[in-house]
Amino acid sequence: MNKIAWAERSCKTNTIGTVNILEILKLIKHKTIAVFITSDKVYKNLEIKRGYKENDILGDYDPYSASKASADLAIQSYYKSCLNKNKNVKIATARAGNVIGGGDWSPNRIIPDCVTKWSQ
């Protein structure tokens, strides 16, 4: 996959996909909890020797990180502008590192490691 196609796919999956889910949550009439698992890639890589903090700068120089940060910002803005008014919907985000990606079954990823352990 060339870089432009990869960038477009990242944006569609991470940003637009998240917005699609948020739009559905606006319509929910029953009690629902949505947990968005994002990534540490939402943060700008400053090459610091500590873990990221919630108030660190979002976004970086590659399309993948930008799409992750955009999704995270969409979640925040939807919550502040409309979802906080719907008492049936609760949302949360969790920024985890090394969860999984499309076709990513590398070792030391949360989802593949869980699947491996559960299947034993």
Segments from the language model and where they lie:
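Serine-hydrolase catalytic-loop signature spanning alpha/beta hydrolases and amidase-signature enzymes
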Residues: 1-3
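Catalytic helix-loop patch of NAD(P)-dependent Rossmann-fold dehydrogenases
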Residues: 5-23, 30-33, 42-99, 105-106
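A generic alpha-to-beta junction signature in SAM-dependent methyltransferases
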Residues: 28-29, 118
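Residue(s) in the substrate-gating loop at a strand-loop-helix junction
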Residues: 39
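Alpha-helical substrate-binding/gating segment
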Residues: 83, 111-120
